[in-house]
């Protein structure tokens, strides 16, 4: 029993001790593997926005939620800006300590992890192309300009929402862009941020809280608790791209569409299953790599 407890990997599954799958499911791997993503997001956000600390920038919604929570708990606005990355690291350190797993990590595993994340992003790319055929483009899946604006032809929906006129799933524009044109760098930066902070909120935190509620409060079976937690977290993940709660107010970020909602829900289920099997590092990495691939595909082939 002790061995099983100490080497229980991912969120709900076991792998052979010290195998690649077991090692890369450890929280310490998530810290080291995702640290460059976090740094790139923080630095990139500053570079692509003016007046960073005065709220005139594009940010990932989940990042904003963490900021506001920290401000509510007594942190200043400047501290709230730098604190969310520390929250990610602290949570993962806590999980690493609680898991009782080895702290050792092998740098040789990081390239295979990046390749794995890229390959795991492919099914979502294929699904998005299937649902948004270029023959009959459905336009933006994540955001709209004003009601009179024409939807552009972008085929591959990204997992973030950054400006008023492009495909995305998870970040929202707060303020105005520095330029009217779309920034490829900005979309890559926000995609990386969405991969980390949305997976933190909707998978690592929300699924665990839902599991506790269904198992410990409602006394449901583990199987039923897991199914309900995955479905609810996926639905909320999808819904928050249509209606978000920011700065004490609800706001609509995109008109509701069943195809859009369905794709995001499927993506949420996919990420939840991936989280249950492979842990936070691979899930967040897959989310981020999907956003990057989708951004590049849209920019290279589908925008005009």
Task: Place the predicted regions along the sequence by residue.
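N-terminal juxtamembrane cytosolic/stromal segments of multi-pass membrane proteins
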Residues: 1-28, 56-59
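Interfacial transmembrane-helix boundary/kink motif in multi-pass membrane proteins
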Residues: 18-34, 68-79, 101-123, 222
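Alpha-helical transmembrane segments of multi-pass membrane proteins
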Residues: 34-55, 128-133
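Perimembrane loop-to-helix junctions flanking transmembrane segments
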Residues: 53-73, 174-179
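Alpha-helical transmembrane segments of polytopic membrane proteins
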Residues: 74-87, 256-263
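Transmembrane alpha-helical segments in integral membrane proteins
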Residues: 84-103, 200-217
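Juxtamembrane helix-loop-helix connectors linking adjacent transmembrane helices
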Residues: 98-194, 211-220
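Transmembrane helix-loop-helix hairpins at the membrane interface
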Residues: 184-304
């Amino acid at each position: 029993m002790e061995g099983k407890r100490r080497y229980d990997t991912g969120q709900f599954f076991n792998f052979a001790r010290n195998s690649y799958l077991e090692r890369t499911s450890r929280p310490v791997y998530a810290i080291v593997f995702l640290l460059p993503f976090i740094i790139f997001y923080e630095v990139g956000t500053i570079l692509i926005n003016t007046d960073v600390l005065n709220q005139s920038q594009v940010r990932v919604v989940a990042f904003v939620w963490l900021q506001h929570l920290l401000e509510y708990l007594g942190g200043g606005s400047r501290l709230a800006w730098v604190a969310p990355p520390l929250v990610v690291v602290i949570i993962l350190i806590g999980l690493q300590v609680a898991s009782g797993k080895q702290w050792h990590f092998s740098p040789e595993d990081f390239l295979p992890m990046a390749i794995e994340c890229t390959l795991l992003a492919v099914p979502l790319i294929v699904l998005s192309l299937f649902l948004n055929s270029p023959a009959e483009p459905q336009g933006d899946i994540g955001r709209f300009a004003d009601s009179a604006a024409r939807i552009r032809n972008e085929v591959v929906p990204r997992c973030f929402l950054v400006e008023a006129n492009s495909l995305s799933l998870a970040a929202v524009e707060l303020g105005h862009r520095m330029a009217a044109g779309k920034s490829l760098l900005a979309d890559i930066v926000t995609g990386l941020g969405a991969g980390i902070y949305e997976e933190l909120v909707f998978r690592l935190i929300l699924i665990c809280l839902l599991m506790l509620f269904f198992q410990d409060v409602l006394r449901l079976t583990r199987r039923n608790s897991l199914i309900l937690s995955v479905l609810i977290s996926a639905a909320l993940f999808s819904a928050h791209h249509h209606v978000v709660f920011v700065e004490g107010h609800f706001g609509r970020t995109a008109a509701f569409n069943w195809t859009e909602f369905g794709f995001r829900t499927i993506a949420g289920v996919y990420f939840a299953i991936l989280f249950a099997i492979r842990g936070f590092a691979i899930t967040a990495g897959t989310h981020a790599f999907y956003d990057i691939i989708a951004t590049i595909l849209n920019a290279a082939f589908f925008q005009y």
